[in-house]
Amino acid sequence: MAVAFLLPYNIVSSFTLGGSDMRQVEKVIIVEGRSDKEKVAAVLNEPVVIICTNGTISDARLEELADELEGRDVYVLADADEAGEKLRRQFRRVFPEAGHIYIDRAYREVAAAPIWHLAHVLLRAHFDVRIESFMRGRGE
C-alpha cells in the first residue's frame, strides 16, 4: 500500500510514517487546500509527500521550502483560478524546475475535479495511480 505524507507547509521534517521515511520520498506535490491533498492522496499508488499551502505561502517560507526540498522532484497542482496561478508564479520563481500539473479549467478546483480526471492528470505527470480511480465517478 502506498503512503502519502499529508503535511501543512510549515511541517516538513524528517520522520517515519507507515514504514516509509519521508526523507527518502523523492516526489513532492504542492497543493492549496486540505481537501485537495486528501483527494490527491486517495488517487496515488506510490509514496509522495503532499504539502498544503492553505492557499498562500510567504516568500520567506518558500525560500525555506527550497532548502528543505532540495534534490526532490517537486510538482505544483493548484486550482484553475487566480489564487492558483499566483501560487504557480511563486513556485516558478523559486523552483524553476518544478513540474506543473493542471486540471481542466471546467472543474476550477482540484477538490471539485472528478477522481478519474485527477488520476488521469497525475498519470500524465508520471505518478503511479490506483487503477480503480479511473473507474470511480465516471458519471460525475
Give each language-model segment a name.
Residues 30-32, 78:
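Short beta-strand scaffold positions
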Residues 10, 32-33:
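Short N-terminal leader segment in a subset of presequences, especially plant chloroplast
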Residues 36:
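Conserved structured catalytic cores and adjacent interaction surfaces
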